[in-house]
């Protein structure tokens, strides 16, 4: 489970369980990924109830994304082409997009046209 996007009420019991698991994970000395490991333990081992959102709520496969020119938005590459809610620039391979806000992505549109688009939200 990727925790790039998640939400909890401030008084949710999940926070205390997650903090307990995070303290345990940090004792191992490896900081990177500890938050994610702790959340996975919280959900799958401690069996805290959650609602897992679909991938279009936290999309991180940029090379598989499509663009709907008629709606001017990124969409899933497969039917029914849900609108992508959040594009998660996770991992070193996306550093060029994370550090250069003007970097354009070559993306295939639903009309099978290659177009250049900014991966970032632009009003």
Each predicted region: which residue ranges?
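A glycosyltransferase accessory/donor-loop signature
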Residues: 2, 10-123
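Substrate-binding/active-site groove segments that recognize
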Residues: 6
């Amino acid at each position: 489970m990727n925790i790039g996007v998640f939400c909890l009420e401030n008084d949710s019991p999940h926070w205390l369980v997650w903090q307990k698991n995070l303290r345990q994970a940090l004792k191992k000395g490896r900081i990177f990924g500890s938050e994610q490991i702790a959340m996975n333990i919280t959900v799958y081992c401690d069996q805290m109830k959650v609602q897992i959102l679909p991938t279009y709520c936290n999309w991180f496969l940029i090379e598989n994304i499509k663009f709907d020119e008629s709606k001017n938005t990124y969409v899933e590459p497969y039917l029914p082409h849900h609108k992508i809610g959040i594009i998660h620039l996770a991992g070193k391979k996306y550093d060029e997009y994370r550090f250069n806000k003007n970097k354009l992505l070559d993306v295939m549109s639903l009309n099978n046209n290659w177009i250049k688009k900014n991966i970032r939200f632009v009003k």
